[in-house]
A protein has these predicted regions:
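Active-site helix of classical SDR
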Residues: 108, 143
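Substrate-binding pocket helix/loop in short-chain dehydrogenase/reductase
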Residues: 84-85, 92-94
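Conserved glycine-rich cofactor-binding loop
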Residues: 13-14
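Residue(s) in the substrate-gating loop at a strand-loop-helix junction
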Residues: 127
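Alpha-helical segment proximal to the catalytic Tyr-Lys
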Residues: 113, 155-157
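Conserved NAD(P)H cofactor-binding loop of Rossmann-fold oxidoreductase domains
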Residues: 76-81
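C-terminal helical subdomain
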Residues: 160, 166-167, 186-227
Length: 228
């Protein structure tokens, strides 16, 4: 898939998702943002709450109907709710898993039939905390460990028909950490990756020749402490 075509990007209104949408557009692709917020970029947008799986699936089908199919999907939407498991509001805990894991699966479920027609690709977004556990992050770790496992199983299931890449990024310079208690923010000396640089790796995965797969990408700064 050397040409990007129509690319669905969840979470494309901010952070990594916005950087991916911009990178896709700069390379001649057509990004379509699925997000609860409208992107400031002016890219085509579907209002979607990824916590509602059927809503997410319907949005994918609407995009495919408008564009005559889709060529790729990037599931960059992600949220967190920090704290000890007994202290986190259960509805907040459940929403983290719903958005990060179930939302990812919903996008894939709806997208795969279209991607199979064109040997398209899907890039799921996990985290280094999908490989390494951290206290006070049970919801996030559960969801991101789940994304890693889901992506590996999906790659087996769709082998030869759809390219599946799991991106495993470390901390990035986004609003993801805003609004947290200080104890849950990166330390002042933490070096975080610019999302634009991480987005370049997503485009790299999307543009591999047919038959060549980038199965997993661990992308961090050289001083990242969360992996290994």
């Amino acid at each position: 898939m050397s040409e990007l075509g129509t690319v669905i990007v969840t979470g494309g209104a901010s952070g990594l998702g916005a950087a991916v949408a911009q990178a896709v557009a700069e390379r001649g692709g057509t990004p379509v943002v699925l997000d609860i917020k409208a992107p400031s970029s002016g890219f085509e947008w579907e209002h979607v709450d990824l916590a509602h799986a059927r809503e997410a699936e319907a949005a994918v089908r609407r995009v495919a109907d408008r564009h005559g199919g889709i060529d790729a999907a990037v599931t960059a939407a992600g949220i967190d709710s920090c704290g000890r498991i007994e202290d986190v509001d259960p509805e907040h805990w459940d929403r983290v898993v719903a958005v990060n894991l179930v939302g990812t699966a919903a996008i894939a479920r709806a997208a795969v039939p279209y991607l199979e027609r064109c040997c398209g690709r899907i890039v799921t977004v996990a985290s280094t905390l999908g490989l390494r556990a951290l206290s006070d992050a049970t919801a996030y770790c559960a969801s991101k460990f789940g994304v890693v496992g889901f992506s590996r199983a999906l790659a087996v299931e769709t082998a030869g028909r759809v390219g599946v890449t799991c991106l495993i990024p470390g901390g990035m310079q986004t609003a993801f950490f805003d609004g947290r208690d200080e104890q849950y923010k990166p330390p002042p000396d933490a070096v975080l990756a610019p999302p634009e640089q991480v987005a370049e790796t997503v485009v790299f995965a999307l543009t591999r020749p047919n038959g060549t797969e980038v199965r997993e990408l661990i992308v961090t700064t050289s001083t990242e402490s969360s992996w290994p």
